[in-house]
Amino acid sequence: LWVKNGKSFLEIIFKQVEQQNVRLALMNSFSTDRETREAISAMRTAVCPLIFLQHHFPKILKETLGPVSWPKNSALEWNPPGHGNVYTALWASGSLDELLKNGIEYAFISNSDNLGAVLDASLLGYFAENGFPFMMEVAERTPSDIKGGHLAIRKKDGQFILREAAQCPEEELTAFQDIQYYRYFNTNNIWVNLPFLNRFMQQAAVLSLPLILNEKTLDPRDPDSPRVFQIESAMGAAVSIFKGATAVLVQKSRMVPVKKCGDLLLVRSDRYLLTEDARIVSNPDCKTDRITIALDPRYYGKIDGFESRFESGIPSLLECESLTIRGDVRFEANVKIVGGVVIENRKSGQTTVKTGSVVSHDLVL
C-alpha cells in the first residue's frame, strides 16, 4: 500500500532510518510477519531491522465468555493483543537482550502508520539527560480528538495515567470528552530506557497494563459473524506503572496517523509533502489550519473501494476546511475542494466529479 509519492510506509520508514543512522526494530503480528519480511526483501535495502513477534490471544465469545472455535478459518480465532504487548514481546523474544548487548540504551517506539513520528535528537537528549525511565509524547486535544485517550493524574500518588474511551463508563463520557479539563492526548510516541525496562521485566516478567476489551465481529469481513471480545492493552498505559515516568508536550506535526481511508486521503493529498529526508510535513501553502474528512464507509471503508474512486488522483485540499462524501462518488483528475463541502450522490449508481472541477459549496449529484 503506497502512502505518499508512490512510496509505502515501510519504504518511507527505512529511508528515515538511513538518514538518521539509527537501529530499527519491528514488532510484527502473526498475521503481518510474512508479508512484512517479503516486502523488506523486495526493497533490497541496506537496513537490517531487528524483527520480533507480538504474542497472540484467543478471541472471546461475547455470548459465552469462552474462547472462539471457528473451524472454517482457525486463524480468525486469535487476535494480536494490542501494542501494549511490545514490552513483554521485546523481552521474551530475547530482542531486548540483543539491543543491550549492542550498546543501545534508549528506544523510541511509535506506530508504523504514523510517519510524523521521526526520531528527534532534542527529545532524546531531554529524555537521557533527566534519567527518565519512560516518556510519553502528548499533544493538546482539539474537538476532533474527543474520542481518543487522554492523560490524567492519579490522585492517590500523583502518577500519570492514560485513560482510553473503551475504559470509560458511559456516565463519565461527557467529562472524558472535556478538552479543557483533560487537555492532553497520547500521541503513541513513546521513549523507553532499555536498562530500566530490562530490570523491571526481570522482576515482573509481565506488565499488568489496564485491560481493554474491544468488541468486534469474529470475522471482520462478515458483519453477521458472532460478536467477540478482543483482549488488548495500550503501550502508553505503562506511564501508570513505571515510577518516575513523565510526559512531554509536542507539536501535532509529530502525529500523522493513517488508521482509516479518510486519513490516507489526507496524507496522499497536497496538504502534506514528503521531504528529501523522508519526513511527512504539512504543506506551507495550506490556506486552512485544520481539516476534517468524512467518507461514506459503504464505498470508501475498504482500500479497494477507496482506490477505485480516486484512481485518477486525489483532489487538492490546500484550501479545504472539511470534506464529507455521501454515496458512491468517483473523482476524476485535477479536482479542487475549497472551504467546507458536502458532496452527496442520492442516486443508486455511481456518479462522477469531472476533471478540473472546483467544488466550493455543497454539491448534490
Identify the meaning behind each predicted range.
Residues 1-236, 278:
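Domain-scale recognition of functional cores that engage charged ligands
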Residues 125-365:
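Left-handed beta-helix
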